[in-house]
Design a protein with these regions (language model features):
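N-terminal leader segment of winged-helix/HTH proteins
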Residues: 1-31, 155
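C-terminal regulatory/oligomerization modules of transcriptional regulators
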Residues: 1-2, 123-155
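Pre-recognition alpha-helix immediately N-terminal to the DNA-recognition helix
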Residues: 8, 12, 19, 23, ...
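Short, locally clustered residues in the helix-turn-helix/winged-helix DNA-binding domain
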Residues: 17, 42-46, 107, 134
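Charged, amphipathic alpha-helical coiled-coil/dimerization segments
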Residues: 21, 71-138
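Residues within the alpha-helical elements of helix-turn-helix
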Residues: 43, 58, 76
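Short capping segments at the starts of secondary-structure elements
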Residues: 47-51
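Residues within helix-turn-helix
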Residues: 52-53, 64, 71, 91
């Protein structure tokens, strides 16, 4: 790819991100979730006890936006807050049973959207894109990948 190439890689990545986000946002309405709420639920399941501020860092959105999403999930009974044992200013987040069930359905929705949007690609191409995106995120926002993998093995 030359410097003069259009569309640029960044433009293509942004377009694909917009396509997935739009489709996922529409599909998540079935669970009455926004993208931020879906992300918060997933992050809490991946790392039980995580704070809203940490989820915001991982997600690349403002603490205020994530705080609003988390508050709505708490009000719906999908998440619960507990005081942090060593920090009076921080609250730890945990999923309720209902939150886990909603997250499982939302994950199925997200996987379906991913299958649909990547259907033109071969399995090898899908693996390549996943590997390359993982490397980029690992380099540019390692917090996004800072999850407790023990919680993944329990699911």
């Amino acid at each position: 790819v030359t410097d003069a190439a259009f569309p640029t890689t960044g433009y293509l990545a942004w377009q694909f991100s917009q396509i997935i986000a739009g489709r996922l946002e529409r599909a998540l309405r079935a669970e009455d979730l926004t993208l931020a709420q879906h992300n918060a639920l997933q992050q809490v399941l991946w790392t039980p006890g995580v704070s809203a501020a940490e989820i915001a860092r991982r997600s690349g959105i403002t603490a205020q936006s994530m705080g609003a999403a988390v508050s709505q999930l708490v009000e719906r009974g999908l998440l619960r807050r507990e005081p942090h044992p060593t920090s009076r200013r921080s609250m730890r987040l945990f999923a309720t049973a209902e939150g886990g069930a909603v997250a499982a359905r939302a994950t199925s929705i997200a996987r379906r959207i991913e299958r649909e949007t990547t259907s033109p690609l071969s399995p090898d191409d899908k693996d390549s894109i996943h590997r390359l995106l993982y490397r980029l995120v690992e380099e540019l926002n390692p917090d996004a990948l800072a999850i407790d993998t023990r919680s993944l093995n329990q699911s």
